[in-house]
């Protein structure tokens, strides 16, 4: 009798322990089947595993170490200009479609909630474009402060420093909006937005100027020829008129990554920037080496691209793995404005990089400031070894 009761309790324990797991497994399987058969994005090309689960992206991004961007490039070579890269997101690789996805004006584009999952508590997490419009309208309808600024009543402020976090702490925001965690989220967003990308771009530019003496000498000749020998740094407008310097900067921004490396340094240009069209379907008509294609992207689903994918496209940038500033110049040696529209280092549309002008100015200023400082040195590529190390 006791043995029967004992066996019954064991069966009950196993049932209670395994039943939830069995239900979850069945649900996951059915959900995966739905995603690759009846889901609105099921008709788009791409690996079935990527469409069925986020585990596919997790493997390349976490286990392999930030390698999904490189994998996406290979997926485009296999499947064409539009690829399904996870259950709820498409990725495109067509420069002519960029202005449709990353648009400005009345055509609304919201951020993907999946992309914003890592920005909990930050102002970056505000998704809706309607919310931004509301804020702008509210500020415009309050002209009192604008009047005081125009009349000079609020002009006596220190312009050398803008302590954002001190302003937040001293504001009238609710206490929960001024918590330590909230400030940490805001600091994280501000740090990731610009510091690493500028440093990586400048490191790439300086390395290639030293590793390629011909490019370095040509740039120095232009600077010595068109910029005065004064110790003062020329103005930004003067530097932007130098075609070869601008070409070097553009090439440095484009080629921040070496595809031959197994691990790539972090930079926002590697990230996908998903956009969601909330009020319209997006129609894609284009082609690739695999032939012409036409797709209708349903509204409410994310579609993205990344600067690294576009900048590695051999059809736009032949020999993309090489550092070649001449690609940005036309036959007359002037800036190639048509090619410049393919530079996506600062994204495009209504939510492009707010610090793009500061970043460009920094990238122009550093090489120009060294125009008189390298005349006593000669370098060859054999003397250099460029490595990226992660700081703990």
Swiss-Prot record:
Judging by the UniProt lineage, the source's domain of life is: Eukaryota
Does the keyword Membrane belong to this entry? yes
Membrane-spanning residues: 10-30
* SUPFAM superfamilies, alphabetized: Cytochrome P450
Principal location class: membrane
Database matches in PROSITE patterns: CYTOCHROME_P450 (PS00086)
Q: What pathway is it annotated to?
A: Secondary metabolite biosynthesis
Query: What cofactor is needed?
Result: heme
UniProt-recorded name of the protein: Cytochrome P450 monooxygenase ppzE
Species for this entry: Metarhizium rileyi (strain RCEF 4871)
